[in-house]
């Protein structure tokens, strides 16, 4: 197996005023070659796409108040405003119906059905308290991560690119990737979260 080297690229804090491809090109000048795979955090991609909101801009529905009570742990969907934020994109009734379907599927031993039917339920990041000025924001999943990855690869001339959702709980998922990339292999490489979950730039 070829030796791998993970090289974090330091940037300033990116905002909705930035273009993600332009920013990556700016901060990787002279660092990326034809054999390199470039990975970018999904939350940063989403922020540059203006896909975020603040809790005070949301009005929680009764569906959100009910459903969050059945979500275990401290994930985004256990938060009232995290749940409502996902509903803003998926639809309140769709989320509720899919939640019921997922609950029934779970009784028969099939987990994760709700998250597969309502993708924003798994992609929405609740308020984290980190990375100002977005420390008080709820960040949605990115739009067209496959397209973003292809644009990055084309602009930089690298081996490949991907948009990944990684955290410090040993969970890693590749949401978008350029042609020729095997997402499961990349997810395994990123499992130790080189992006970081605090205020890393």
Show where each model-derived region lies.
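N-terminal and secondary-structure boundary signal
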Residues: 1-201
